[in-house]
């Protein structure tokens, strides 16, 4: 592919997951000739940061922020592709480095607005969720107020991987790690800014069979903070990179052609 047509994708995972969850998407985008970086956030995937070192959202997102910081002024802008809780991480990155981001693509992701604290969109969904719904998910409360979570296999099977291949679910069971839970204690209470994060092009990909972040909730976030374009993968569960990787890649390539 001509260098002028090559796009730069940066893939941002959600909690308990890591760069590993993007293996199908990364391979397909690279096969199409594009540059793809899948980041392990702190204490995720193979990143060896200890949970004790994560006190803030910036701490958790440090690998992503360091990658964007390393890009020179001559580098092309990146397309941030954010899944699930990765939407909050990508939004922080865009708030800090708006000039380096061509667009954020929210894939069944929590999308902060510019009037509420960053964690609000997640806390609003889970505030009434009972322990029965979380099933075998394990929560830890250390001495400090930051909370941690580890998705259990029963929860993942029912809510995250319900339409995904069994092999990918097995990969997830072996690979998930304890992650910081998105609270105001972690993310702070200051909203992202209108002139930085708010100025970056945002696209939302709705996953039509998502039972973790239901379609009505996905569309509610879009209504509350409208985006440039809304696309949908009708038969995707919460993990479209596993359940509908080809459809997801096709949309990402379409987005890259339009916005990067």
Swiss-Prot record:
Its EC number is 3.1.1.-. Keywords: Hydrolase, Immunity, Innate immunity, Plant defense. Expression of MES7 can restore systemic acquired resistance in SAR-deficient tobacco plants. It catalyses: methyl (indol-3-yl)acetate + H2O = (indol-3-yl)acetate + methanol + H(+); methyl salicylate + H2O = salicylate + methanol + H(+). GO terms for biological process: defense response to fungus; innate immune response; salicylic acid metabolic process; systemic acquired resistance. The keyword Hydrolase applies. Pathway: Plant hormone biosynthesis. Esterase activity is down-regulated by salicylic acid (SA). Belongs to the AB hydrolase superfamily. Methylesterase family. The active site is at residues 84, 210, 238. It comes from the Eukaryota. This is Methylesterase 7. InterPro entries: AB_hydrolase_1, AB_hydrolase_fold, MES/HNL. Methylesterase shown to have carboxylesterase activity, methyl indole-3-acetic acid (MeIAA) esterase activity and methyl salicylate (MeSA) esterase activity in vitro. Required to convert methyl salicylate (MeSA) to salicylic acid (SA) as part of the signal transduction pathways that activate systemic acquired resistance in systemic tissue. MeSA is believed to be an inactive form that needs to be demethylated to exert a biological effect.
